[in-house]
Amino acid sequence: MSRDEIYRQSQSFLDDFGFGESVATVFDDMLERSVPFYAELQRMIAEMAGDFAMPHTRIYDFGCSTGTTLIGLDQAIGPRGLTLVGVDNSQEMLAKCRAKMAGHAFANAVELIRADLNQGVVMENASLALMILTLQFVRPLYRDRLVRAIHDGLEENGALVLVEKVLGESSLFNRSFIKYYYEFKKRNGYTELEIAQKREALENVLVPYKLAENLEMLESAGFRYVDVFFKWYNFVGIVAVK
């Protein structure tokens, strides 16, 4: 696994954060060192998927990146006649995904699709949809519409599993949670320069909502049951059932 050192050196000009080749190459390391309890989150997602993945349906992973979640789902669920559909807008991420998947003997069918979630989604025969640290990168203007489209594309009793970075409900807690998160990143080997430069690159690219705003968006989209299954300061996991 290549180590994430994209922001290791001081840069006089920072491009907006994107998912091109440089990020795709180190993305697995970036996630493991930047997302609290990342391995446990993956295990929990696969565990829940086992309850919602109906035989002979499709599971959509929107923002599948390098395929870690799809591989984990397939291993946990086993053969059910499913089609696992990975959707991403980055050609470089999809290339890394294909390469990683080549080393895994899948028990279910797999499809990879390039698509821009800002333009909506097309789903069929879907029992489960995943958005793991993805919705936060969709332009706020399109989020409500996207979540409604996912709800409408799910079969009855189908589920959406959503993991997001969130804002604190108050400015007091928000400042504290950000401070704790940066301390977490330092413990995982990131320098203050790396943290500051990545924060600047992500500004206006990653736009988090408050937890309450995400819950309201899911309920407004029509989901009957919505609950939080994971919370760590400014990271949250939500499951919603149609």
Swiss-Prot record:
Protein name as catalogued: Carboxy-S-adenosyl-L-methionine synthase
UniProt entry tagged with the keyword Transferase: yes
Transferase is among the record's keywords: yes
Gene3D superfamilies: Vaccinia Virus protein VP39
Species lineage: Bacteria, Pseudomonadati, Pseudomonadota, Gammaproteobacteria, Methylococcales
NCBIfam families cross-referenced by the UniProt entry: carboxy-S-adenosyl-L-methionine synthase CmoA (TIGR00740)
Key words of the record: S-adenosyl-L-methionine, Transferase
UniProt organism field: Methylococcus capsulatus (strain ATCC 33009 / NCIMB 11132 / Bath)
Listed EC numbers: 2.1.3.-
Membership in a protein family: Belongs to the class I-like SAM-binding methyltransferase superfamily. Cx-SAM synthase family.
